[in-house]
Amino acid sequence: MSSHSPISVHADAILGEDIVMGHGVIVEAGVEIGDGCRIGHHTVLRTGTRLGNKVQIGDQTVLGQQPMRAANSAVTSNARHEGPTIGDRVRIGSSSIIYAGCTLSEDVFVADLATVREDVTVGRKTIIGRGVAIENQCTIGAFCKLETDAYITAYSTVGNHVFVAPGVRTSNDNFIGRTEERFQHFKGVIAEDGARLGVGCTILPGRRVGKDAVIAAGSVLTRDAKPETVYVGVPARAVGPVPPEQLLQNQD
C-alpha cells in the first residue's frame, strides 16, 4: 500500500495489494479493501465497508454513512445497517455519500455529489449522474442511466436499461405530508425495463411506467403508463406508440 500520510487505518481493516490512499483518508474497523483500489484525499470508509478490486473513489467521499432520523421523519428508520458492498471496478466521484446497507454491483459509476441511501441495490454498469439522489429502500437495475439531479423517491423500483433524464422528480406521498393515514400508503414509483423519463418530468406516487414507455420532458404522470407508449403533457396523456426502432429489443 502507498499513501500520502497522515492517514488513519484501523488495525482490524483488511487491505489487499497495490492500494493507493490520498492524504487524510480514514479507514474504520471491519473495512475490507480489495486489490488495486484508489482512494482520494480525505475520503472516509466507515465501519464494515467492503470494496471489491480496482475500485476508484474521489476526494471527500463517505462510504458507510449510517442514516440519521429526524424527530418527525416518515420513512427513515433508526436501525443500524451493515457496511455497504461495492463491487469490482466501481468508480465513485468526489463529495458523494454512499450509505450503509446498500450494494453497488460491478462497474457501476457514481458521479460527484451523488447520494445513495440505505437499503438500495444498484445493478451492474449503471450510471448515477452528478447530484443524483436515490432514497432508501430502492432497487435500481443494470445498464441504467440516471442523469444529473434526478431524484428517485423511497420505495421505488427501476428496471434494467432505464433512462432517467436530468431533473426528473418522483414522489411517494399522495397526502403531501398531511394526516396520519398517509403512513399506510407510501408507495414509490415503478419504471419497467427500457422505460425512458424525459427531462424534468414528474412521476406521482405509485405510478408504473411500462416497459419501453416514454414520458416526455416536463410531463406529469398521474396514472400508469402503458408499455411501448409515448405520454406527453400535464397531466400526461398517451399520444401514440414508441417508434419500433427505439424499442429495447431493437437496440444493439
Describe each region flagged by the PLM.
Residues 250-252:
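Phosphate-binding loop/pocket of nucleotide- and phosphate-handling active sites
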Residues 235-247:
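C-terminal end-helix/capping segment
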Residues 2-70, 74-232, 237-238:
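Structural signal for interior beta-strand "rungs" in well-ordered beta-sheet cores
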